């Protein structure tokens, strides 16, 4: 027969044993109840780096550098130069000395294209993101006017606006708003420093043409790639970014 006194002794023995078990660490792979360790929402500091990293990797995977390197830049310049209208046609109409300059260029090739570190800025209201895509490249120029090969360093920024929009089915998407080259961001300079007066004059004239043509040309290649990359981003990352933009949460952006 099980006596009450025995029950009291048994309970007394179990009490310290239970306390010891509770003090033991949780085995690996075992999740504690939410009441003990409440789940934390993804923090904005994680989003900025994750987004720029995903966009950068995506652009490289889409072949951005190869696309830039294979641009038929000289053919495009000569085609537009012969056209009676357009920015370049207007420029050549005003400065007729540029026509023989184009005709005397034997080769104009992009080499060593680079995608530099992406930048990220948030709008003051917190509902939009602006991604800066900085590009660098070298222009190899051969011309009958100059005996040696000229190397021009080129830098250009493309700015992409990202925002959250709601469709007719009330689904929210992360989309590209404006995508354009940053005004005044194009930099072209002679890698070997200042050349002789004829060489520097040639570089200045060529720079004037490239200022009107190159930004729009590069923009036309980069912006469609951004759309393609955006459509393939990790769903969880997109959801977190959209949620932050809708609520105007400030991203912590490391400079």
From Swiss-Prot:
Tissue specificity as recorded in UniProt: Expressed in trachea, and at lower levels in nasal epithelium.
Keywords, comma-separated and alphabetical: Antibiotic, Antimicrobial, Disulfide bond, Glycoprotein, Immunity, Innate immunity, Lipid-binding, Secreted, Signal
One MF term in the entry's GO annotations: lipid binding
GO terms classed as biological process: antibacterial humoral response; antimicrobial humoral immune response mediated by antimicrobial peptide; defense response to virus; immune response in nasopharyngeal-associated lymphoid tissue; innate immune response; multicellular organismal-level water homeostasis; negative regulation of single-species biofilm formation in or on host organism; regulation of sodium ion transmembrane transport
Any single Gene Ontology cellular-component annotation: extracellular region
Signal sequence region: 1-19
InterPro entries: Bactericidal_perm-incr_a/b_dom (IPR017943), BPI_fold-superfamily_member (IPR051902), Lipid-bd_serum_glycop_N (IPR017942)
Superkingdom: Eukaryota
Keyword Signal carried by entry: yes
Cystines in this chain: 179-223
Claim: Disulfide bond is one of the keywords in the record: yes
Pfam families: LBP_BPI_CETP
Glycosylation sites: 157, 178, 205
Main location: secreted
Segments of this protein annotated with the region Important for surfactant activity and antibacterial properties: 87-92
Localization: Secreted
Family that this chain belongs to: Belongs to the BPI/LBP/Plunc superfamily. Plunc family.
Oligomer status and interactors: Monomer. Interacts (via N-terminus) with SCNN1B, a subunit of the heterotrimeric epithelial sodium channel (ENaC); this inhibits proteolytic activation of ENaC.
Function comment: Lipid-binding protein which shows high specificity for the surfactant phospholipid dipalmitoylphosphatidylcholine (DPPC). Plays a role in the innate immune responses of the upper airways. Reduces the surface tension in secretions from airway epithelia and inhibits the formation of biofilm by pathogenic Gram-negative bacteria, such as P.aeruginosa and K.pneumoniae. Negatively regulates proteolytic cleavage of SCNN1G, an event that is required for activation of the epithelial sodium channel (ENaC), and thereby contributes to airway surface liquid homeostasis and proper clearance of mucus.
Protein known as: BPI fold-containing family A member 1
